[in-house]
Amino acid sequence: MAKLHRLISAVLRLAAAGAAAAAAIIMVTSHETTSFFGIEMEAKYSYTPSFVFFVVAFAVAFAYSLLALLARPGSTASRLLLLSDVMVGMLLTGAVAATGAISQVGKSGNEHAGWLPICAQVQAYCSHVMGALIAGFVSLLLYFLIIMYSLHAVAEPLCSCH
């Protein structure tokens, strides 16, 4: 049973690492230059702090996911994994939420603040950001599954209901 638990955990962590890496890479490659009423406009992920936060958060999640694979079952480090998984899940939730909010402003603008939508002018850039968000949601969902599976694995020995 321990081998099966380790295998499932490893597969989930590798999938989460892959999705996190994809999210960060897609966001980093989001860049477009266009002309708008004769004015050259450049859209780049590094111009938006929440997008930079997104890249850093998913790079951290990628590295953590790979490091977590090194923890031996039953070791002190493996006991800290659940807490660390929750922390990484919260980090990713914040990154996806911040990026989603700013993306919505880029897509629809904000009439009250006087911010115009930009996605009509830089469609490839906005598509890249959307792709990064989708990969980010997948990674976040996988982290949720990792947390639920880890909770189950921790609680199972405590339950005498078998």
UniProtKB/Swiss-Prot annotation:
The segments annotated as topological domain Extracellular are 29-50, 101-128
InterPro entries referenced in this protein's UniProt entry, alphabetically: CASP/CASPL, CASP_dom, CASPL
Q: Where are the transmembrane segments?
A: 8-28, 51-71, 80-100, 129-149
Q: Which residues lie on this side of the membrane: Cytoplasmic?
A: 1-7, 72-79, 150-162
The lineage's top-level taxon is: Eukaryota
Q: Which Gene Ontology cellular component terms are annotated?
A: plasma membrane
Keyword Transit peptide set for record: no
Recorded hits in NCBIfam families, A to Z, give: A_tha_TIGR01569
- PANTHER family assigned to the protein according to its UniProt record, in alphabetical order: CASP-LIKE PROTEIN 1U1
Instruction: Spell out the protein name for this chain.
Output: CASP-like protein 1C1
Organism name: Sorghum bicolor
Classification from the root reads: Eukaryota, Viridiplantae, Streptophyta, Embryophyta, Tracheophyta
